[in-house]
Amino acid sequence: MARKSVIQREKKRQKLEQKYHLIRRSSKKEISKVPSLSDKWEIHGKLESLPRNSAPIRLHRRCFSTGRPRANYRDFGLSGHILREMVHACFLPGATRSSW
């Protein structure tokens, strides 16, 4: 299981990303529309002044139950080994084990 501080840090990043999402998106659209290079640099400076953790690329998907950052299935929000355990225990309706 991931440390609680790492999970809290990820939650903080999610809040920052939601807070600055509209500002970041509007600035990027503005850069593509402005023809002069000096204006683009000004807008780019505004983007750089935003907090680094507000960028969506810095977010990780984490397992809902363990907080594991790797091997996550988006549909379930779980990591692979937890998903497998839950399917074997019949906690996920409709999911079947593969057999061939």
Curated annotation (Swiss-Prot):
Entries under SUPFAM superfamilies matching the protein: Glucocorticoid receptor-like (DNA-binding domain)
Where is this gene product found? Plastid, Chloroplast
Q: Annotated Gene Ontology MF terms? A: rRNA binding; structural constituent of ribosome
Q: Which GO terms describe its biological process?
A: translation
Q: Name one Pfam family in it.
A: Ribosomal_S14
Is-annotated flag, keyword Chloroplast?
yes
Residues that span the membrane, as ranges: none
Q: Which cysteines are joined by disulfide bonds?
A: none
Superkingdom per UniProt: Eukaryota
Keyword terms, alphabetized: Chloroplast, Plastid, Ribonucleoprotein, Ribosomal protein, RNA-binding, rRNA-binding
An example Gene Ontology CC term for this record: small ribosomal subunit
HAMAP family per UniProt: Ribosomal_uS14_1
> What family does this belong to?
Belongs to the universal ribosomal protein uS14 family.
Tell me the subunit arrangement.
Part of the 30S ribosomal subunit.
Q: What does this protein do?
A: Binds 16S rRNA, required for the assembly of 30S particles.
Q: What is this protein called?
A: Small ribosomal subunit protein uS14c
The organism of origin for this protein: Phaseolus vulgaris
